Amino acid sequence: MMGRTALKITLAVAMAAGLLLGVSGCGKSAEAEKQAPASKAGTEKVLRVGGEATYPPFLFKDEHGHYVGFEMDLIKAVAKEIGAEVAYTDMPFSRFMTAVENKKVDVVISAVEGTAERAEKAAFSDVYYKKGVYCILVRKDDDRIHAADDLKGKMVTAVKGSTNEALAKKLGADQIVEAEYNADIFKNLEAGKADAVITDEPLAYYYLGHGGAEKAKTVATVPSDDGFVILMNKEDVKMQQDINGALKKVMENGVYDQLFHKWFNVSVSGK
């Protein structure tokens, strides 16, 4: 997987590339695509996928209302390997765990880290992306926060149920302003509803590169060893085997690198 240097190169190029849609263009109004009937990978030819599409360039809506991004292309490639078509349903981040637990979807792919807490209720795929660092953003005219320790006693906005929210609590934030969608954390900051945002580096760079730099700035980062995984029902051992087997093939046959280059304009190696 990619190291931090490659990630920084990735983000710098992606920011300059001007991907399809700014964060502000994604919102709560995203309607779920038609849900498919219950399925098993490789048998019913349909893989029901859940996600939260306000996380460009990983998963978002383009100007035509289509769900696109690195993760959408990746899960389609994985589904192809197991002989299935993707049926996507958009939902808030906070509903991911119940969706896989109650088998409303077969898998969730949406910048989710494989934490110990989540492992109690869901199964994971192998890691498909290492995120590198968390970013702390404040309004451009705010000079009170310069480091992670400065979040003590402050109001911090983060997506509900995310590791970003957990980090805000760990750093001593006085109040967490929860958001259902990634796009809303930046709206909360801009509206003065929070003193700072904690988010993943890719989303922070995308936001700043699509107009956010006029309103906010990055003041600190916090290292992270977390990686993004695909969630699925804990009891569905075959699904986990199928997904991991397909993901391995996609990573070995060059498709993963092609998709990575498509969305970040750089190879996995950073070249």
Q: Which residue stretches match the model-derived regions?
A:
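Short, low-complexity disordered leader/linker segments with a strong preference
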Residues: 1-46, 268-271
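Acidic, polar ligand-binding/catalytic clefts
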Residues: 76, 80, 85-150, 221-222
